[in-house]
Amino acid sequence: MTNLIDLHKTRAAIPGDLSGLQSDLAQLVGEPFRFARVSYGDELTLHFGDLRPAKSPKLKGKLYGAYVFGSRGSPWIVKSGSQSLVLTADLDGHPGEPVRKEDLEANPLIAPDSRVLAATAFVVKPANAHGVELRFSDGSTLRILPTLAEADDPADAALPALADWELASPAGLLSVGPGLTWSFAPSTRSGEQATG
């Protein structure tokens, strides 16, 4: 069966609606990888599609991909398709050697211009939350795992919930987590990217 997804409508998860989440991820398939950046809080962001200048005057000279995939504060793993190397962040046990932010950005282990072949959401049962795996044409793989819930500090009760991972696109912002929650908010103006 063929399905049409209207990316101009706001959508929120129906419990157990993994297919709806998968449909929103489909917009990333076929897009070329441009570069990786480590942002505030050591969050990994991958940039895809056409490069665009940042909209904020404070970020003048910085480029962003039309699609920006962010790990937020979640653990992630990048497996290179061309090298016997794996990068990890925020995984227990700290396997391997530390990598500087600059080294990661200079060598993200994913070949520039390799295309996204698959973007697959899955449920991580112990965390009762969504993870995601991106597969690239160079054989590389990115996997983002949800952040495990911790005991809430009463002072944190007023803070908004932080997504486990997000995809900003020309169509809008897909936010996933915490838990099995997710939402898609369309861009407010035609052609406006949700970040930058």
Task: List each language-model region with its residue ranges.
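Surface-exposed, interaction-prone regions used to assemble/regulate multi-protein complexes
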Residues: M1-G196
